[in-house]
Amino acid sequence: MSNESIYSVLDLTQVIFEDRYLVKQKLGDGSFGTVYLAQRKEKNGLYETVAVKKLKNSSKPKPKHELLKLRESLALRKISKHPCLIDLLETFMDPYRNIFLVMEFMDCNLFQLFKRRQGRLFTKETAFNILLQIISGIEHIHKHGFMHRDIKPENILVKRISPKPISSRYSIKLGDFGLARPSVSSDPLTEYVSTRWYRAPELLLRSGSYNHSVDLYAFGCIVFEIYSLKPLFPGRNETDQLNRVCEILGNPGIDELDTLHYWSQAKELAKRLGFMLPPTKPYPIQKLLPQNCPEGHAKMIPCLLAWNPDVRPTAKYCKEVFFPLPPSASKSNSVPQKISNPKVEQNLGFPISREDKKSTRRVGWLKKNLSEFVSSVKSVFPDSHGSQPHVKTEKPINAKESTGHLANPIASSNVPAISLKPGELHESVFFSENEQIDYLLTSIDYLPSYKPPSNGSNIAINAFNETVGDRIPSSKDILITEKIPFKKENEIRDSIVPSCSQPDESNKEGVASCLLLQKSGMEMTSVLEYSTPNPAEVQNICNDHAKFETSKSLHLSSP
């Protein structure tokens, strides 16, 4: 097939990119192109925030390579639209024969959401809803004769919504179909696909024959990660990955009666690679799970992680058996639909720390935790296996930096003084004592060397965590948290400057930043933005502000 015939299959229209799109930021580079955050000009004069992937354009393109580049667009065109799949809005070519894929923009990906959790586990209801949307997307792909082949947290995109019930606060969509291909094809299968931590045993052992069950294995790894906020098999390399799999799933050639953990082909495939599988017995995965994981899902994970791909359940079976819906929910669509947002949001993403973009690794992470299971963690989670939360666990070593996923949020600056933007919530949230005035003061910890007094506690942080719960902080949280009741107390207080009830001489080296927001209808308007090297000045400015005259000092305590 020639390049011209490949392009004709897509029926590409020619568009001058600059005439329709305004690039805001480069999000990252991928194997086949670069992803940008952009705004698309609509006929009604409004702008829509989108993710635009510009495919690489080689000087001497070969038809096979061009077809691989366009695989994502071809797959999304053949698979009908679904609320749990990223929406391909447009595919076009510019006069220079550059091809662009335009997709909806999401707030973040699942990996970034894990990091932002800071070790706080999802509730059962929220985890259930996230997993239901993921398995619904996988089921839809398989139903249309495709396999994704790269299911991982970075390719699961997240948008924060505010429906009721509150457990459905996230809209989840599968993205990055660059490795997707038909389940049945005359072309030979690529052996090296999927990301190592989520790679099925048949892929690790370089089997030339595999099917859609590789997606179910990856889903099993993600189920574990959703409940524990930690990866199950964080291997450093291929050999280490196989060893870690054997530590948990056991040697697949020991017990022929163990359907889940026996696979006769594994030994021969490993021998061909010069690898000897360790003679280990299966470790109960249920003991590695925290208590927020329901019994049904704890039983589902070993089935999904079966050595033998033929005994893994299908996506359809998983959805029907392990994700039963109550009668009231079954009458309506439990999967969040696309949220229409004609108004362009100013806050195109939420801030993430620079740690979110690093890709360092800790050697022997899971193995170390396994050895500490009995001695150090059993007292905390009697029925689970403890380890550090996901926030201290990094991405796979083979995961590229900003690999062109559709949702790479705009990072916040890491300088001492930050001028916060409307909608950004940092570590402290403070409210006016006057309930008739709806204000929000956001601020950051400004003194790395400063320790709060022993009798002072940042009550606002605790109240915010309890109220916001699993949501990604955004301007919408203001409408939910503004009614937190605070009582006056004479002894314990939080001042406007975070964690600093008594500023003194030791504070002079610190830098404080704050933003005062005023509610006006459904919008939050910036009333005051201020940065100063003297935290006491921030407090004075806020106290002297006309709208804060009733709050000379905020005396807050727990509700």
UniProtKB/Swiss-Prot annotation:
Q: What does the entry give for GO biological process?
A: ascospore formation; intracellular signal transduction
Coiled-coil blocks: none
Residues covered by the Protein kinase domain: 21-323
Please give the catalytic activity noted in the UniProt record.
L-seryl-[protein] + ATP = O-phospho-L-seryl-[protein] + ADP + H(+); L-threonyl-[protein] + ATP = O-phospho-L-threonyl-[protein] + ADP + H(+)
User: So what EC number does this one have?
Assistant: 2.7.11.1
Query: How is this protein annotated for GO cellular component?
Result: cytoplasm; nucleus
Active site per UniProt: 150 (proton acceptor)
Report keywords, A-Z.
ATP-binding, Kinase, Nucleotide-binding, Serine/threonine-protein kinase, Transferase
- Specify which residues bind ATP according to the UniProt entry for this protein: 27-35, 53
Q: Name one GO molecular function term.
A: protein serine/threonine kinase activity
UniProt-listed InterPro entries: Kinase-like_dom_sf (IPR011009), MAP_kinase (IPR050117), Prot_kinase_dom (IPR000719), Protein_kinase_ATP_BS (IPR017441), Ser/Thr_kinase_AS (IPR008271)
Biological function: Protein kinase which is essential for spore formation.
What family does the Swiss-Prot or TrEMBL record give for this protein?
Answer: Belongs to the protein kinase superfamily. Ser/Thr protein kinase family.
Protein's UniProt name: Sporulation protein kinase mde3
Species in which this protein is naturally found:
Schizosaccharomyces pombe (strain 972 / ATCC 24843) (Fission yeast)
Q: Give me the gene this protein comes from.
A: mde3
